[in-house]
């Protein structure tokens, strides 16, 4: 829900002057909410919420207020939208559901764990009478029965975690991607070569798609030796061998460069460590030369008795 940043229209200002008053809003809801909805609402808990869901460029046509309240089913909201324009919006039902979902989203972002009930209410003041359109958003579809069935049922789910690998192998052009995404978190993807190679040999994927999959394995997966994995795959799938060998060579080069960098870094760290030790020994030597007792020197420098024994006065 966003803050309003345009100058209020006379419609908007007047509407808000009244409907932002809880007592007036309570009267409005007692008068106009359907009985079955009014029965689930505790109107004594009405609380005005800040902001607006109406887009800035539409404020001359619409105004809205949002109230939170307690319902018999937990937290809830009543969103009142008033239409100022003379010609009614035939997609108003869809607008109402969009704003209701936006209110639900804001509720979740505030840290709540469950979706709230949001009751949209349209306050129509246009010239055309009576209001000519349905406020049931599903009626905006060509096939309302099918839309009702779709949006009131569980959505389709593809849970790859429960599909057997043998079944996945028969999924044609989706097989390789599905298999890899199912096992991407396993300990070592190199164990998948025996299953992956026959799928790639089936010829459903182009070389660019195979390369994309291998990069995905290297970047997102776990394998003890990525280069060896890719070389093995190149031998098993000769039609993509050149492309895969190119990747293997790139991985080999990266490994060499990483080894060089690691060696250089270790050399730097070793040199730094040796330099710090030499400086500490020098400080200890000076302290001993100034007749500071050995226990104090060891405590202040962290050196041991053996370290001090190496110091020549």
Curated annotation (Swiss-Prot):
<dbReference type="Pfam" id="PF04754">
    <property type="entry name" value="Transposase_31"/>
</dbReference>
<keyword id="KW-0460">Magnesium</keyword>
<keyword id="KW-0540">Nuclease</keyword>
<keyword id="KW-0614">Plasmid</keyword>
<comment type="similarity">
    <text>Belongs to the Rpn/YhgA-like nuclease family.</text>
</comment>
<dbReference type="InterPro" id="IPR006842">
    <property type="entry name" value="Transposase_31"/>
</dbReference>
<keyword id="KW-0378">Hydrolase</keyword>
<dbReference type="InterPro" id="IPR051699">
    <property type="entry name" value="Rpn/YhgA-like_nuclease"/>
</dbReference>
<dbReference type="InterPro" id="IPR010106">
    <property type="entry name" value="RpnA"/>
</dbReference>
<protein>
    <recommendedName>
        <fullName>Recombination-promoting nuclease pSLT051</fullName>
        <ecNumber>3.1.21.-</ecNumber>
    </recommendedName>
</protein>
<keyword id="KW-0255">Endonuclease</keyword>
<dbReference type="GO" id="GO:1990238">
    <property type="term" value="F:double-stranded DNA endonuclease activity"/>
</dbReference>
<keyword id="KW-0233">DNA recombination</keyword>
<comment type="function">
    <text>A low activity DNA endonuclease probably yielding 3'-hydroxyl ends. Involved in RecA-independent recombination and horizontal gene transfer.</text>
</comment>
<dbReference type="GO" id="GO:0006310">
    <property type="term" value="P:DNA recombination"/>
</dbReference>
